[in-house]
């Protein structure tokens, strides 16, 4: 393994922590087509906040010819000497919730241009079972002119990064590995085992590893959909859902999930990958898609609950001032991709309310680019007819929310983290 040189393709929330970890033992080239991202990383700063600046700076190198460490580049020339290529690009869905494999195709083309005999290409992106061998490998073969499992090989090791989580970092999460042949499976497993302290699980085939990843997220999506449905039912009965879940949770085998908005680039997306693949085989999934529909309905449900509470408090809805706390997809993380807080905001605006969005974690330029919404990173002055806590950022727990409300204002807690006696409604 001494001659090993790794290229990590895609330096986002998944790729950068992995590249940094590999760089503690191996020479690593981090490759990304975004030149701004490369400049930022080479200066020793990570805007995703997944890798602390000091930790990043500890492995950074100034050129591609180093012994161990990380060099970030957008130049194809810098990755041509690598013999392991790890692809960590996003796998989103389009506006019709169909899998969009464009980033995978493009990154496979990139690797195909520098692929040599004996190289191993490992995919980490979440896909449906069969995508690596049926969609990605043909691109590698076509561009490189090499033959799969003769000249070059493949592996699949699904990412399990939890953005914003400083406890379960990449090396502390057990890694599923796989290879295109039994021998390659062992090599891929050994590579990850050398840096992942939590250990590895070698799956028998690439398809098994792909399927394992996509059901991890689908299972979580379905479990959250169940408690979201319970929240709707118990709210009609005037029963506190969180109190019910707390009581039920005293049984040893009750699974603890909380109601909420399900967004981000994994849980709200991956079930569609599995569903489409199932449909290609002639099976129409019922529970998977029902869970997606229910979770996707929660933003408009929250908005309508807030409007109902405002009407009951004799608040005029048109031009009412509403403060939304948080637009990222989860707490203590700057990632705004596929955030469902946007559904709440858009629904509120459809009632002609004036919505102010405060999020100290979100990059305002990114929010404008993604959703055409104005946000602020500093707490705005003034008082509001309604405040909705949509994201549990630690900063929000320190706010005196009562002082931001008008005398008859409404406080709604989507996350269930505020004192229930202080709020007018919660999921």
Task: Label every model-predicted segment.
Residues 1-427:
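Structural/interface elements that position substrates and couple domains in central-metabolism enzymes
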